[in-house]
Amino acid sequence: MALAADDILAIQKLIADYNHAVDVGDGPAFAALFVDGGSLDSGFNVIKGYDELRDFAGMVPSMAPGARHVVSNLSIDGDGDDATSRLYLQMWATAGGAAETKLVITGRYEDTLKRDGGEWRFVTRKMIPDG
């Protein structure tokens, strides 16, 4: 059975919550978006488990001041309590001041998702940089 519209909307919200949490460095909120033992492959390293995910998100504002994750072309498929999503990413950040916003990276995400305790969460999120 295909996903219900409410499930698709909940997954869209999960993805938006991810972007907002990582951009402001809210490590606890970011890590809570993943199942226990969930992982993020950033394209450069793999971050796994609540503590590593929390610490990673907490560092983003200092590594990429003014970071803004902008995603598009979201495609969600699934059945029951399992789903996948694919989407494109642009990450913008400031360099030397707010007036100098630049495109830092482009790529795509490939996600595996699971309904966990009634909420959709990431099992794995893989970022595949362009080029």
Label each region the model flagged.
Residues 1-28, 32-36:
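Short, low-complexity N-terminal intrinsically disordered segments enriched in polar/charged residues
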Residues 13, 71, 108:
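Short, conserved clusters of charged catalytic residues that mark active-site
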Residues 27-91:
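A solvent-exposed, acidic/Ser-Thr-rich amphipathic alpha-helical stretch
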Residues 84, 106-131:
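Short beta-strand edge/turn micro-motifs at domain boundaries
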Residues 91-95, 113:
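Beta-strand elements of well-folded, non-transmembrane domains
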